[in-house]
Amino acid sequence: MKSAARLLLALAVSLPAAALAQTPTEPVTMHATGHFDVKISPQTPDNPQAKASGLARLSLDKQFHGDLDATSQGEMLAAGDGSTSGAYVALETVSGKLHGRSGSFALVHRALMVAGTPREWTVVVVPGSGTGELAGLDGAMTITIVDGRHDYDFSYTLPAH
């Protein structure tokens, strides 16, 4: 018992006072904007269940410009009539720099369109997916498409340095 007490005392004395008094810092809220180029390629289903499902499987390849200088690759599943109504879900991994901070993170998409009008469209950071200087990243991205140009508006938080 005395050995354990001595060990605890030695540890307490050796820890810097600042480490003992640290309080968690609040995340910094940021806002990033820009546009991206995207290549969407149909993938051929390789099993009977995928063919029978009627779902379209597509690969995504993106180049982000602006506050997010990055590339991404991902996979999308889509259903619907292909022109005015449908839905898609997707996952993509983004690698590059966000406001100068390097790393990678994953995004998850969910969208519904009815008669040519988006009903829901969410794109959020997958919790725990941030790496490098983007570890702890959390946020949501809004995408608008006008005349074929994809613009993004990314509201996010990162732990303070």
Per-range role (PLM):
Residues 3-5, 11, 15-161:
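Targeting-peptide/extracellular-domain and disordered-appendage signature
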